[in-house]
Amino acid sequence: MEPLISPQPRFRLQPIPENPSSSSSSASITIPRSISNTSFFHEISQERLLLHHQDLEQSVQDDKEDQDSDSDETNRFLSQTRPLHRSRTAPAMVIIKDLRTKPPETKKPSPVSKSIIRQAIFLLIVYLTLGVSIYSFNRDHYSGIETHPVVDALYFCIVTMCTIGYGDIAPLTPWTKIFAVVFVLFGFGFLDILLSGVVNYVLDLQESMILTGIQTRQHHQHHHHHRFSAKDYIIDFEKGRMRIRMKVCLALCVVVLCIGVGALVLHFVEELGFVDSVYLSVMSVTTVGYGDRAFKTLQGRLFAAVWLLVSTLAVARAFLYLAEARIDRRHRKAVKLALNREITVDDLLKADTYQHGFISKSEYIVLKLKEMGKITQKDIDQVVIQFEKLDPNQIGKITLPDLLGDPL
């Protein structure tokens, strides 16, 4: 039988005896220790791991060298100063500036209101000057108790312009009657509108001053927690204006004040009784003017020239605020009903503008705004026309180049 050969090729091949006991008898043959297959593959794997680890170290070192070279090139590139050109598709700096949040500002009267005040004062002076001049040169053509020509003329002009019509001073001749007709129409139709603009300006100025004072105090106390207080009944902080009911209360207080002041003057100057003083004061403020009572003294007519002008406008403003409050209350009810009403199939079909079988959030908002009465289809059509003007390419979008006038 042939002897077994060791499978490990890197060792010198030596014969392995078949019987181990015969090793003692043969001294010329040396028998090495046999190596198993497990230890053989284990040594090979260790060598491979060692080689792989060396390769990894070499690759890491190469990467570091590449990074160093790239950083050197980048530094050399940055060291060379080059002008940066702004892309034409980048947002304009004006638009970016406008996108910054701005603190809320208190609404202030516009310069247009100031111009209306100047026009109203100028026309009022012209109106009164013309009336006083014509009355002064034609005193014999008017009936009534005379005190002073200028005072009587001013009193007559104010009573005519405010449409009170006491009847204590009235024209007698056709010429003075024609003048009275023109004077009434001109004063009632034009100057009264301008004076109402003056009242609006004064009230808006007062409102802005109140809002500014309250907002200033809140700015100093911003670290405190907001609690519901009496100021919330006066100011609508979300809309930045006084509440309607507060405006009505202020207007009514002004009316009561005018009635009280007029009654006191009538009682002490015209020497009327308490009931007659209040009666004439109310009839004058409300522009009823039965004519059974009127101002007869010089001091009373001077007072009436200023008091009637202020009080009649205050009463008109109070009635306007009352009407505004009723309309606002009606709108709130309509909004509440529109929000609580569930949408129907007909509503979905009407609101589905693009016939998709569903409505989006914007379409739902438009539907509810229509139900609330805040917008109409005419308003939507006007907005659509404006949108089409801003979208010259008719792509259904307004892009930045369209606004800047620089199409791509």
Swiss-Prot record:
In this UniProt entry, which residues form the Stromal topological domain(s)? 22-115, 199-248, 323-408
Q: What is the recorded name of this protein? A: Two-pore potassium channel 5
Name the family the entry cites. Answer: Belongs to the two pore domain potassium channel (TC 1.A.1.7) family.
Localization recorded for this chain is:
Vacuole membrane
The record, for InterPro entries, names: 2pore_dom_K_chnl, K_chnl_dom
Give me the Gene Ontology terms describing cellular component: plant-type vacuole membrane
SUPFAM superfamilies per the record?
Answer: Voltage-gated potassium channels
Cite the record's note on assembly.
Homodimer.
Membrane topology for this entry?
Multi-pass membrane protein
> What's noted about domains in the record?
Each of the two pore-forming region (also called P-domain or P-loop) is enclosed by two transmembrane segments (2P/4TM) and contains the GYGD signature motif which seems to be involved in potassium selectivity.
Function text: Probable voltage-independent potassium-selective tonoplast ion channel.
Q: Where is the composition biased (Acidic residues)?
A: 63-72
Entry binding sites for Ca(2+) 1 = D352, E363
List the top taxonomic levels of the source: Eukaryota, Viridiplantae, Streptophyta, Embryophyta, Tracheophyta
